[in-house]
Amino acid sequence: MKEQSERLTIGTFSAASFLNDLGSDMIFPVWPLFVTSVLGADMAILGLIEGLGDALVSLSQAGSGYLSDRIGQRKIFIWTGYTFASLSRVGYALSQVWQHLIPFKILDRSGKFRGAPRDAIIADISTDKNRGRNFGLLRAMDNLGAVCGIVACIFLFNYLGWTYNRIFLLASVPSLISALLVLMLIKERKVGAIYKGLSLKDLSGNLKLFLFLSAVFAFGAFSYSFLLVYAREFGFETGFVPLLYLAFTAVASVMSLPFGKLADKFGRRAIVVLSYSLFGLMCLGFIFVQSFEGVVALFVLYGLYRAAADPVQRAFVSELAPTRYRASILGAFQLIVGLCALPASLIAGILWETVEKSAPFLFSLSLTILAIVLMGFVKES
């Protein structure tokens, strides 16, 4: 019975993630083009909006992680987060200038507070032998939904001639279904009010170091939007740009579960180092790339990085964290990464506008190398 309940929980979260990303990625392939070409924002403004969104993701997850542990409830944060995502896309469809996007971006990204409580549930019902697989499966379903969303976007945009606004409205529906699935199928397991607070002395030196180096890496991990705009300015037609987004998302979808299994077999630290190395190689490639084929290959490399980094980092943090603080520390991890993401995308946009297109990649490469060096001092727990 317990095993059946755990399978239902993982299956429900996987289905909800699939549907939510289906909606999200009907928007993402054309989002930077919508913001810059239709609403008239420049690259610095795009970087500010993207960085603000990433920072809000982390702030919301840190808060929800703490509250989830404090009140002993997870489910309410999860279904509410999916509802926020649905409502925000209606707002995007109604926006007439880039300034209108900001409140709806805040609503959208603050809805990510579902992440830490959901990850805590998954970590709690998993074992050391299947934790990487479970997180990898969740990420694989995320990415599979993204692939389907991108295909839908390409079909609606390129072949049916749908406007951005109609696509955004349709994209609101899957996340609403995700909220209903969680409401109906996830049974709240009372975890109790676990603790009164969390301080640095509760964290091991190992965990503190990993959080620090994650911040270093995140400071250079700019938004995917820069890659899409780079491709357009490199010479790819506007209608082809979503296909590049599809390429890296499909790779991430296919490879997330294998990377999760590799992490179970060879350790989380090795796969985190591999993911950072893949990102560094991608940055190096964008500095020197001179062919269309090379750009496509670098998007594939970015997909491999996403497949390795996203699930394995969360699994690694959940193992380094004391069990009673797990949701809070997962939220704190997202907070640190997101607060660094705001200046990361903003700095990348400023470097792009004031220096040259290769400058953001060189900046990110330097920080990636530093993070890899620091990772050598983190011990597998």
Regions found by a protein language model. Give the residues of each.
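Helix-loop boundary and gating motifs at the non-cytosolic
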Residues: 2-57, 207-244
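Structural signature of the two symmetry-related core transmembrane helices
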Residues: 76-90, 172, 270-285, 365
